[in-house]
Amino acid sequence: MSVTESRTPFNSSLRWNAIQRIARQQARDSLLGWSLYLAAAIAVLIAVILVYNSIRFVGESGLNIVLRPFFLPLQAALSLALLYITAEAALAIARPREQGALQVLFFAPIDIPVLVGGFFLAGLLVYVLFLLLIVPVLLILAWITNFVVPTGLLWGLVPTIFIAGVTIAFGLFISAAAPSARSTVLLLVAAILILLVIQGAYAALLSIPPTNRFYDALLFLRVFLGSIQGLLSWVSPFRMLDIVLAAALRGDWLNVLQLVGIAIIGTLFWLAASVWAMRQRGVLP
């Protein structure tokens, strides 16, 4: 059943005020809940484990330095942040629609673009809150372990907000298009697993030495997955996160700006797809 949108005329000021109200309410619910803090604690725990492994490696190998010691812990923490906000966005529409609460919102003077925009802005606010929770702890961890955190890596946190926008918009599209909250979760998990399996399989194939007897036999598969990996660098948020942080670390800001532009285009595409899907799917369970 398609949704019936409000016929009240909107101007840009009214739309923006409505988007802000929805975003503040959603962000407030996340701030007062427990899932945000649990996800942040897990992200910090993963970073601590990775830092501990680096320290242990230095002690056992006798090395005095480690290349990019804080890159992997920060990348892992931010990847978990992206997973969290994507899951939140994926349930933002599907869950209240399944509960019958979504249709109540349309008694207020809002329409579908305003609702999607409010959920999108809320996701960005939650991501920034996530950063504010984990980054100070990671800096304290770096100070305790005497690991240097390059300034470029910290500046690289700013463009990750645009990458977060892609994941939020994609999550909203799944939420708007899926028939139920359960199917939303299944679709999201399937998409994430496909991305991780492709990247993991390609990394495993690259680790096979040329002297291995299966090296030539796997050439076609290696080239095929390499092509997909190249495509993922333009569409996968996790791959984009890796490239953005690496580019920021070496000071290649032109590459960062290119990826930010790609992220903005992807965000606009998925937001438009979310509005279309919600108009097709409607607000009723």
Which residues fall in each region the model found?
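Aromatic- and glycine-rich beta-strand/loop motifs that create alpha-glucan
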Residues: 1-41, 278-284
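Central hydrophobic cores of alpha-helical transmembrane segments
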Residues: 41-43, 184-195
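Aromatic-anchored segments of alpha-helical transmembrane domains
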Residues: 46-52, 141, 191-201
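Secretory targeting signals
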Residues: 49-54, 59, 63-78, 121-184
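Terminal transmembrane helical anchor/hairpin motif
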Residues: 57-60, 197-275
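Long, hydrophobic alpha-helical segments
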Residues: 69-95
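Hydrophobic/aromatic residues in alpha-helical transmembrane segments
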Residues: 82-89, 137, 169-173, 186, ...
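Helix-loop-helix units of permease transmembrane domains in multi-pass membrane transporters
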Residues: 91-124, 128
